[in-house]
Amino acid sequence: MPHLLVTFRDVAIDFTQEEWECLDPAQRDLYRDVMLENYSNLISLDLESSCATKKLSPEKEIYEMESLQWENIGNLINHHLQYGLGDNMECKGNLEGQEASQEGLYMCVKITCEEKATESHSTSSTFHRMIPTKEKLYKCKECRQGFSYLSCLIQHEKNHNIEKCSEVKKHRNTFSKKPSYIQHQRIQTGEKPYECMECGKAFGRSSDLIQHQKIHTNEKPYQCNACGKAFIRGSQLTEHQRVHTGEKPYECKKCGKAFSYCSQYTLHQRIHSGEKPYECKDCGKAFILGSQLTYHQRIHSGEKPYECKECGKAFILGSHLTYHQRVHTGEKPYICKECGKAFLCASQLNEHQRIHTGEKPYECKECGKAFFRGSQLTYHLRVHSGERPYKCKECGKAFISNSNLIQHQRIHTGEKPYKCKECGKAFICGKQLSEHQRIHTGEKPFECKECGKAFIRVAYLTQHEKIHGEKHYECKECGKTFVRATQLTYHQRIHTGEKPYKCKECDKAFIYGSQLSEHQRIHKGEKPYECKQCGKAFIRGSHLTEHLRTHTGEKPYECKECGKAFSRGSELTLHQRIHTGEKPYTCVQCGKDFRRPSQLTQHTRLHN
């Protein structure tokens, strides 16, 4: 079988003259070492003693070169590296018929002599012109002998390793060639001879060091044609391109889930096997990923290496800092296709989408209740266990979650960091602000499946859904039933006349605290709910909602008797009295009844 033609140029990295001059001595030495290592890998392919190659001429004459010594080739390569790869080689030997290709050294090296030598040499002789001896930087670890070139050291170490062949065979992985053996040996010994001058990180292979140094230089030579994103390694680009193609070649045999990256597939399998090889020495908690353990250990150490330059807030994870910075920039790149709502991070979008799909994958084994989020289940389990690990130092009150404690502590400090840009109202937590902003936007994302009524908060929807179910709380005075005990309590005040919420300005009293809050806006002149269409402002959010219907023409309240529609529920109530004949407002003077209080007011003026 004929030998395949493989050139050293196929595995070499070239520099132009200008690029070569820009390299400092340390970089040139590193480059030299890498080229020698690459050549060592080539020379290990059973072509050390003899090889055949075709002469690059029309005649295609075959030249045979036998017994070409490995050390001579190493010196020749060193000569190339010292003066830059690609330069013409010179020698004083009489080697007519051989040539040095500018396209790269063939494995069975061809050398052209431009000057005829005075002495005669055979093709198997060593080169007449050798590289000047330089400092012997390369030391043998076995006998401490020094060498000028790494190639000579590798060949020398080969002689030592002949004695250890019997031991090497006992290993699972055996290597017949020197470079592979050296790399394998470093894996077992943990030796990392290639150290980064920038950060001190060490590597077992010089090629790994070169890749690592691109982090410091910010060099990313591999660019994606689809989105322009650049990468340090070609393998990273290959994996990234699967994002655009949608290719997921790694499929789990257990559940059928597919992955773009092999590493993702490997980690996923630990979910099925339950393997958690990374254990915390402080608390014994185990993790699937080593990075998870690293982040977890920062909880014990209190280390937060990622700090926001805007506000100084620090984080355990770099991803948390990235998400936090979007609070300052306002960037929300993850948009829900169902409702258009945007989010800071992908996990928030995934959790939000479960509202539309109704998916609740986290189920409590105690009571069967299911949740959108895993954290919700964790907190819920503490309801059964009674565990409240987060305690307030001010009042001793304990909480299920740390976030609840932080929010509670703001009651003592008076801190309200979340401020509405529309009306300036401030809140203790971000959730309250988000819910409040829906008053201005009119958004009601939580809809009742029974009647279609929508709400600002999920808590309101939960309360409303009880209307369609049983009503356990009944008023003994009038027989009216209620879903909640608090509703019954407020209702009973109508019969008792109790109005515990009193205005300090005018002594007017109210049944509900919310009524007092709204009333106090009259004294302050505060109208926080403003219409974006015409600028008209209102004391109550419900008044704004009703007003907006004058612009949209919406009339959601329809009479079942005649089909007439109204923009307000109160208008429908008054209208229905026409059909029922109900007249609840009676004149004290003459006993006449009226449907509306305004009609009674006008009538009483006749008596006066």
Swiss-Prot record:
C2H2-type zinc finger span: 138-160, 163-188, 194-216, 222-244, 250-272, 278-300, 306-328, 334-356, 362-384, 390-412, 418-440, 446-468, 473-495, 501-523, 529-551, 557-579, 585-607
InterPro entries named in the record: KRAB, KRAB_dom_sf, Znf_C2H2_sf, Znf_C2H2_type
Domain of life: Eukaryota
A GO MF label: DNA-binding transcription factor activity, RNA polymerase II-specific
Gene Ontology CC annotations of this record: chromatin; PcG protein complex; transcription regulator complex
Main location, first listed in the record: nucleus
Gene (name only): ZNF571
Protein family membership: Belongs to the krueppel C2H2-type zinc-finger protein family.
Record keywords, A-Z: DNA-binding, Metal-binding, Nucleus, Repeat, Transcription, Transcription regulation, Zinc, Zinc-finger
Localization, UniProt: Nucleus
Protein name per UniProt: Zinc finger protein 571
Cross-referenced SUPFAM superfamilies: beta-beta-alpha zinc fingers, KRAB domain (Kruppel-associated box)
General function of this protein: May be involved in transcriptional regulation.
Annotated KRAB domain residues: 6-84
